[in-house]
């Protein structure tokens, strides 16, 4: 064992003292190592005012990213279908090949993603629509952190609404689940289940 260790130490120290061998000096390798010189200082892939998000043209008017998002969200909240939005964007009667190259294609695909996300949504709060699994995970965190029903109803957008509006609200089931979890947590604590034993 000691011999192996000494052999490794000797090998490492030998390699540490060696100088690196120079690369072959062929015209090709010199060209590869030579710094690139060009008349341009930098290469810009986009201009500063170029649009980066989904934009669309509606009724002959070009909409910027913010306007596009606002319109798509409005259509989503009013329950518009993908075919009706496709028709509004002028893509309905086109072949798939034509539609893909149309200026409103990105807006339509964005709307489809928004629609799909909303369909899978259990509640809407925070950054937007949340899945059932994510919502229940957050509800458990809030219960264990000791958040009050008032705090959670505020987070879910239910605070200050009438009873009728709360019952009709899309986050009502999430709030009921929070109350159920809270009750179960209190029962567990009352039974000493959550106390650590050493």
From Swiss-Prot:
The keyword Signal applies. Induction: Expression is up-regulated during the early plant infection stages. GO terms for cellular component: extracellular region; host cell nucleolus. Its main location: secreted. It is found in: Secreted; Host nucleus; Host nucleus, Host nucleolus. Keywords: Host nucleus, Secreted, Signal, Virulence. A motif (RxLR-dEER) lies at residues 43-52. It comes from the Eukaryota. Residues 1-20 form the signal peptide. Interacts with host MAP3Kbeta2 in the nucleoplasm. The RxLR-dEER motif acts to carry the protein into the host cell cytoplasm through binding to cell surface phosphatidylinositol-3-phosphate. Secreted effector that promotes P.infestans colonization of plant host. Specifically suppresses Avr4/Cf4- and AvrPto/Pto-triggered cell death. Targets the potato MAP3Kbeta2 kinase, a positive regulator of cell death associated with plant immunity, and perturbs signaling pathways triggered by MAP3Kbeta2. Belongs to the RxLR effector family. This is Secreted RxLR effector protein PITG_22926. It comes from Phytophthora infestans (strain T30-4).
């Amino acid at each position: 064992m000691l011999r192996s260790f000494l052999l490794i130490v000797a090998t490492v120290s030998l390699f540490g003292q060696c100088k690196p061998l120079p690369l072959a000096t062929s015209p090709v390798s010199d060209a590869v190592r030579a710094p690139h010189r060009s008349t341009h200082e930098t290469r810009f892939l986009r201009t500063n005012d170029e649009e980066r998000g989904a934009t669309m043209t509606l009724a002959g008017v070009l909409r910027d990213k913010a306007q596009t998002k606002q319109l798509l969200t409005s259509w989503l909240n009013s329950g518009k279908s993908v075919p009706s939005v496709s028709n509004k964007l002028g893509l309905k009667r086109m072949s798939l090949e034509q539609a893909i190259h149309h200026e409103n294609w990105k807006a339509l695909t964005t709307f489809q993603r928004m629609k799909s996300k909303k369909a899978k949504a259990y509640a809407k709060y925070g950054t937007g629509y949340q899945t059932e699994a994510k919502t229940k995970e957050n509800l458990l965190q809030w219960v264990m952190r000791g958040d009050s029903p008032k705090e959670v109803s505020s987070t879910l957008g239910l605070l200050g609404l009438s009873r009728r509006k709360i019952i009709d609200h899309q986050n009502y089931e999430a709030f009921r689940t929070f109350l159920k979890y809270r009750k179960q947590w209190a029962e567990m604590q009352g039974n000493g289940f959550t106390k650590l034993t050493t």
